[in-house]
Amino acid sequence: MRKMKSMKVVLAALFGLSFSWNVCAQQSDIKDQGYVHKSSTSYEYPTDPAVLQKLDQWRDLKFGVLFHWGLYSVPGTFESWLLCSEEKFIPRRTKIFGDMPYDDFKKWYWGLSESFNPTKFAPEVWADIMKDAGMKYMIFTTKHHDGFCMFDTKETDFSIAKGPFKNNPLKDVTYQVFDAFRQKDFMIGAYFSKPDWHCNDYWSRDRATPTRNVNYDIKLNPDKWKRFQEYTANQINELMTRYGRVDLLWLDGGWVRAPKEDIKMDQIIDKAREYQPGLIAVDRTVPGRNENYQTPELTIPKRQLDHPWESCITLTNHWGWWKDAPYKSAAQVINILTEIVAKGGSLVLGVGPTPEGTIEEEGIQ
């Protein structure tokens, strides 16, 4: 009996040490990011039996990977957020680019599409690495807020498939990633940004862009907004019809929601499920029928939760690739995963491939 009590004390101490370590890591990541999205405060279970079945399957997987790969990978910087002129994001830009005028910075950033040429991209290697790490599902950034598409969309030429990589047989990057991971029995997720800062029907080029939001009055420009609604729906339909089985639609940019920025998400999800029955929708930070699981960012809930949830936590201190970024150790990732699973959740680990298309050796170790 004494041995049993001693063992419980040791395990409790180890878990407490692990928890303390995880909290410190989370605080460091949040400080480096400067901003994280807050989780929803309520949850609504889906009613579609096919969705419930797939959600149960997903909850059993526990460990996945979230790739952030796009224009921001070329210089190795803060994803799309340097384009945002909100006060909280300006220090990020000035720290790296000094007093470069904002309009000049935007032109420079958009111009990265002419130099993004990941000639070492080998999706089957990515899949082998993540499978060896014990991961069971994968989410890939098909489009971040900057609007640059990592798939061969018909809606815009602002795409990996239209730049220097266009003659490469792997030019439809999303297709290649999905196919490689599907062959390794991964559940497949498509990250998709609802806001699109490159699209003239979201950030109109004849107006300033002082915030992350649409920069014109929707009520005064209904035709312009309708075009954006159709643009968004068409791109999601492309992903649902041309890329094989898709299990998750992971939607970012929670400020794009009814009533202020209504893109008719209910209709989009209903249509998507006609092509992908049982599709798990993750309209993150927007509680209701289209947020089938919650996504606390760079943090772990303090207590066990009864509903489905996933902590999205970076392997380094950034979502995308940064040169010489510090990696979490294998022991640290295991501790994070252990705490999350003990609380009933899943861990999706953020990994940023290099601009050449490789996973850094330190990240593999």
Predicted feature residues:
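Mature catalytic domains of secreted/periplasmic carbohydrate-active enzymes
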Residues: 26-365
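Bacterial Sec-dependent N-terminal signal peptides
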Residues: 1-28
